[in-house]
Regions:
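Sec-dependent signal peptide recognition
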Residues: 1-7
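Long, amphipathic, charge-rich alpha-helical segments that form helical bundles/coiled-coils
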Residues: 63-119
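C-terminal motif of bacterial Sec signal peptides marking the signal peptidase cleavage site
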Residues: 9-12
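Generic detector of well-ordered secondary structure
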Residues: 15, 39, 76, 82-83, ...
Length: 141
């Protein structure tokens, strides 16, 4: 019986560590994509400004709207992410994982997977809107 309990503890710890490592990997992927997109924010602003300088292109132009939607989706992502994961809690504070149960780690993992999908969606909006705006600019130059 003693061996069964020891085996259970080892498996449980192993699973917790696996979830923790998965969470860290997801978290790092999300942060890298976030940082890359933050660098693109300037490009969105520049493309929008250049488009608005063209006669006949107004704020209600589809390309302008898409650039605004992309920018706002990033703002919403950052707000939602920071509301969900404060700096003093896991996974922002990686040291706190020792105090978490497997179910808590799993919940964090599920939330991180949702945020990964969300930041991927933001990235798609950035790519599509910048490409569309740049095509208009390239056609005029």
């Amino acid at each position: 019986m003693k061996y069964i309990f020891t085996l259970f503890v080892l498996i449980s710890c192993s699973n917790n560590n696996s979830l923790h490592l998965s969470n860290l990997e997801l978290f790092d992927d999300i942060m890298k994509e976030h940082d890359d997109l933050m660098l693109e924010m300037k490009n969105i602003k520049n493309i929008k400004s250049s488009l608005l300088e063209i006669d006949g292109i107004e704020e209600d132009n589809e390309a302008i709207k898409n650039l605004d939607v992309a920018r706002m989706s990033m703002m919403n992502f950052m707000k939602d992410f920071s509301n969900e994961f404060s700096f003093d809690k896991y996974p922002m504070d990686k040291k706190t994982h020792d105090n978490l149960e497997e179910i808590d780690l799993l919940q964090v993992n599920n939330k991180l997977n949702e945020f990964k999908k969300s930041i991927d969606d933001v990235s798609d909006k950035f790519e599509t809107s910048m490409s569309s705006g740049q095509k208009i600019l390239d056609g005029i130059e």
